[in-house]
Amino acid sequence: NDYSKDCYQILYDRYRNDEIYKICRYALQRVAKSYYIPDSTNTFIFLWTTLEAIASPEYENVKKWKGKVISFIVQDQTNYNKLGEYIKKISKDVRTELVHNGKLIQDLDDYSTMLAIDKELTKIKNIIIDYVIAVYITGIKSFTELDNHRKELQNKLGVN
């Protein structure tokens, strides 16, 4: 996916300054900054907290926020469930190990190579970017409007 044109437009939009625009721009800036973090464990945590931040202005656990993100970036219930399972698995198997058990990502069984780690980090970056673009193009300017639109999307997907 070539995100460059959409990302550029979001980063440098001179006509919007609302709370949704700011969180979208903030998320893209964090994705860009993540490339400069030399440690993969810290990169993962940085990106994961970005996912949490774009889902809601208040802290929510993964069970609550994952549906908020997923509903904007999938087209059907099958993909909704698939992405939801992926996020739940990564939260349990990776985030918990890094954040609560103090492990390094490269010490986890599935991430013993840089290729495996980079693949996972890229997946997370793409989820963030897909969400940001989907939200930005709605033109929605407040979290209240965003929640209402999200509920409509979830109804269409049959996942509420």
Spell out what each predicted region is:
Residues 1-160:
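Amphipathic, oligomerization/interface secondary-structure segments
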